[in-house]
Amino acid sequence: MSLTVVSMACVGFFLLQGAWPHEGVHRKPSLLAHPGRLVKSEETVILQCWSDVMFEHFLLHREGMFNDTLRLIGEHHDGVSKANFSISRMKQDLAGTYRCYGSVTHSPYQLSAPSDPLDIVIIGLYEKPSLSAQPGPTVLAGENVTLSCSSRSSYDMYHLSREGEAHERRLPAGTKVNGTFQANFPLGPATHGGTYRCFGSFRDSPYEWSKSSDPLLVSVTGNPSNSWPSPTEPSSETGNPRHLHVLIGTSVVKIPFTILLFFLLHRWCSDKKNAAVMDQEPAGNRTVNSEDSDEQDHQEVSYA
């Protein structure tokens, strides 16, 4: 086996001591793969186990293979402890599901909870499948998209990956149609584009995948509100409710304003009318009033 590490020891010595470490004493660490978990044959991959708990040792275990449990001294930097397990030349017998654990020096029999599982897959072993998009690689926003992965090879499972995402989607291959086996991955209404690839695998070797399909760029154009009418945005035949809301709102504001304006105009006109009537009184009345006023003035002078 070509699994190499800076320093390692089989944790089997615990069995020789007649004791198996207790798990779950500390929080689980994290397990990452650099540059990624899909590895071509003969390439190098680094499995990094790290934690904010200051573990003195890290153990790496592959499911189903007890003898593949490896141990490394942890490195401490900036409040983080970590260990890098290096697979220098990827081979089929090194693919599988890995987990890591942490332990401290004063309690070597007590391990942390296991990290989340990490599947290391070797790719490029079989013929590449084809990847296509329905209705096409360029779609309107909100339009339903389905990606079809197909091949003449009788793959049992297809795997769809998207650049920038850590996990793949998988579907079993359907029945043979026109000489090909395929799986259809519905993506639902399109919102964002992306670059996709797909792989094929067989049931008896789930960690050994085919070559990657050619990359497929899915582009999304347009605005969902413009491209796809919604209950709040029907077609022009039924009118636009947003415009209707604006009109209704404007009308509600205008009605009381109009009533108030009418009331003010009516009052102003009434005042003007009364003023005009006063101006048109007979001259006799005005004379009498004047004489009465003079008469009163004379009386006041007499009394003086």
Swiss-Prot record:
Gene3D superfamilies: Immunoglobulins. Keywords: Cell membrane, Disulfide bond, Glycoprotein, Immunoglobulin domain, Membrane, Receptor, Repeat, Signal, Transmembrane, Transmembrane helix. It is found in: Cell membrane. GO terms for molecular function: transmembrane signaling receptor activity. One of its GO terms (cellular component) is membrane. SMART domains: IG (SM00409). Its main location: membrane. It is a single-pass type I membrane protein. Expressed by NK cells. Interacts with the adapter protein TYROBP/DAP12; the interaction enhances KIR2DS1 stability at the cell surface. This is Killer cell immunoglobulin-like receptor 2DS1. It comes from Homo sapiens. The gene is KIR2DS1.
